[in-house]
Curated annotation (Swiss-Prot):
GO MF term list: rRNA binding; structural constituent of ribosome
GO-annotated biological processes: ribosomal small subunit biogenesis; translation
Organism lineage: Bacteria, Pseudomonadati, Pseudomonadota, Betaproteobacteria, Burkholderiales
Name this protein carries in UniProt: Small ribosomal subunit protein uS4
PANTHER family, sorted: 30S 40S RIBOSOMAL PROTEIN, SMALL RIBOSOMAL SUBUNIT PROTEIN US4M
SMART domains linked: Ribosomal_S4, S4
GO cellular component, one term: small ribosomal subunit
Any Pfam family hit: Ribosomal_S4
InterPro entries tied to this protein: Ribosomal_uS4 (IPR022801), Ribosomal_uS4_bac-type (IPR005709), Ribosomal_uS4_CS (IPR018079), Ribosomal_uS4_N (IPR001912), S4_RNA-bd (IPR002942), S4_RNA-bd_sf (IPR036986)
Superkingdom, natural source: Bacteria
Record's keyword annotation contains Lipoprotein: no
Annotated transmembrane regions: none
Entry-linked HAMAP family: Ribosomal_uS4_B
Segments of skewed composition (Polar residues): 42-52
Organism listed in the record: Variovorax paradoxus (strain S110)
Amino acid sequence: MARYLGPKAKLSRREGTDLFLKSARRSIQDKAKFDSKPGQHGRTSGQRTSDYGLQLREKQKVKRMYGVLEKQFRRYFEEADRRRGNTGANLLFILESRLDNVVYRMGFGSTRAEARQLVSHKAITVNGQSVNIPSYLVKTGDVIAVRDKSKKQTRIAEALQLAQQVGIPAWVEVNADKAEGTFKKVPDRDEFAADINESLIVELYSR
C-alpha cells in the first residue's frame, strides 16, 4: 500500500485523536473536530464497533502516527514478539527508536514527516556518519546531528525553537545551539503515547 499523501487533519479526525501529523505551530484542534469522522455527516451514533474493528483501528492509528506501512509494521511486530518482555511495549520501543522519530523527538523536525524528509535528504548524521534511512534504529548513546550545510535551514531553526517551548523528552538530550543530541535511552512505556492501547494490536496479530 502506498504512503498516504492526503490531508493530515482528516486522518486525525478518523482516529479521534491528534496523530501529531501537523506542526504544533497551529493547534490541530483548530483544523479538525475529533468528535466527528471525515465525511458530510460525520459519525453515525448508536453504532457499536466490533472487537476486530477496534483492534484494526488501533493498528491503523499507530501506523499513521509513526508513518509506517503494513509490511514494515508487521516486521516490527514479529521482532517485538521475539524480544523478551511485553510484546506491545516492545513494538512501541522499536517505533520510538526509528531515526526519523528520534529526529522528531529531538526537535529537528516539527513533524515526523518533516523529520523523515530531513533524513532522506541526507541532512542528518549518526555518530558523525550520514544516514539517509528513516527506519534506521538508533541505539542508546548514539549522537544525532544536523549536518553543517543544513543547519541554516529556516524550518530546522523554527522546529528547534518550537521544541524548546513545548519541551524535549527526557530520553534524549539536545544541544540546540549545535543542532545535535544524544539518544540517552529507550523511553519507559509510561513516558510516552498514553493514548495508545498496544494490547489491541497484539490481539489483532495473534488472531
